[in-house]
Amino acid sequence: MEKFTIKDLTDNLKFEIISGQDKLDTEIKSYGINRAGLELADYFKPFKDQSEWRATLMSTKESGYMLQFDEETKIKKYTQLMKCGIPVLIITNKFKDKTLIKVAKRLNFPLLRSDYPITIQLVQKIQDIYDIYFSPTAEEHAALMNIFGTGVLIKGKSGIGKSELCLDLIKHNHLFIGDDRIILTNKSNKIIGRVHPILKNLIEIRGIGIFDIVKSNGYQVIMNESPVELVVELVEYKEQNIDNSDRLGNDWSKFKILGVEIEHIQIPVSAGRSLVNIIESAVAQFKINKSKQFENVFDVIHKRTKEFLSSKK
């Protein structure tokens, strides 16, 4: 897990920094957002480790509660809150008590303000950022495309043609997420893939070199991230002169990523095969398999065979 700091939060959500500018490198170690209701009512849950304290949010309800107290009481409550171990305080524009700002500046405590009009939307945005840093993460040497609305992780040994396949898929109006280094994150038991920031929008084609997909094809072919629903593994068509590839369309297996099982299929690569059409067909079949229209191919063949034999009697 990457180190997650107050600065990461402010950079991603463009918060106004009211105080504690020199403490933005403070690490946020606990997942989630806390509302300050109980703490403002003088109840502080004892933690063995200070790092268990979450970032704390205050908005309309907390403001209304605090405005009923005199100045001395408010200063005492805010001071207790800022000294209890929380890493940062976030307020919305709906928080009207200016005493908080006065106390935060006196203590040089990290206080941020958001202009999000709806508090629940702000909480969701913060949680989305947290997911990037706190969720289980892995890295795959692969490419990631979104094909017909389905996130497809394309694996295979180096030099087998993953990048070239991505380029062909882009020409077919499918969306490019990344190539070579794909970062996979488990968010609520769903695998989300994105490219390593260093390689964003870049692709390497042997014989040509590295070039920028945005500059050559435009922003319309780019996605920042995508759920991964299908893993396609490119394999050599023949190994030791034996063709082990599936010919009946029943060889769908599972590929485990961060504890989540993803549909997986191997596609043999050989000269003369149109990989783009094969990949598109594989994704189409995957979508059919998930739909109510799915019918097992062996059942279909068995049914047709019986009908054919019956017609010959």
UniProtKB/Swiss-Prot annotation:
Binding of ATP: at which residues? 156-163
Reaction(s) catalysed (UniProt annotation): [HPr protein]-L-serine + ATP = [HPr protein]-O-phospho-L-serine + ADP + H(+); [HPr protein]-O-phospho-L-serine + phosphate + H(+) = [HPr protein]-L-serine + diphosphate
* Annotated coiled-coil segments of the chain: none
Query: Binding positions for Mg(2+)?
Result: 163, 204
Q: Name one GO biological process term.
A: regulation of carbohydrate metabolic process
Which InterPro entries does the entry link to?
A: HPr(Ser)_kin/Pase, Hpr_kin/Pase_C, Hpr_kin/Pase_Hpr_N, P-loop_NTPase, Ser_kin/Pase_Hpr-like_N_sf
EC number in record = 2.7.11.-, 2.7.4.-
- The region called Important for the catalytic mechanism of dephosphorylation is annotated at 268-273
- The active-site annotation reads 141, 162, 180 (proton acceptor), 247
Q: Member of which family?
A: Belongs to the HPrK/P family.
Q: What is known of its domains?
A: The Walker A ATP-binding motif also binds Pi and PPi.
Cited function? Catalyzes the ATP- as well as the pyrophosphate-dependent phosphorylation of a specific serine residue in HPr, a phosphocarrier protein of the phosphoenolpyruvate-dependent sugar phosphotransferase system (PTS). HprK/P also catalyzes the pyrophosphate-producing, inorganic phosphate-dependent dephosphorylation (phosphorolysis) of seryl-phosphorylated HPr (P-Ser-HPr).
Q: Which HAMAP family match?
A: HPr_kinase
* Name of the protein this chain belongs to: HPr kinase/phosphorylase
What organism does the UniProt record list as the source? Answer: Mycoplasma mycoides subsp. mycoides SC (strain CCUG 32753 / NCTC 10114 / PG1)
Q: Gene for this protein?
A: hprK
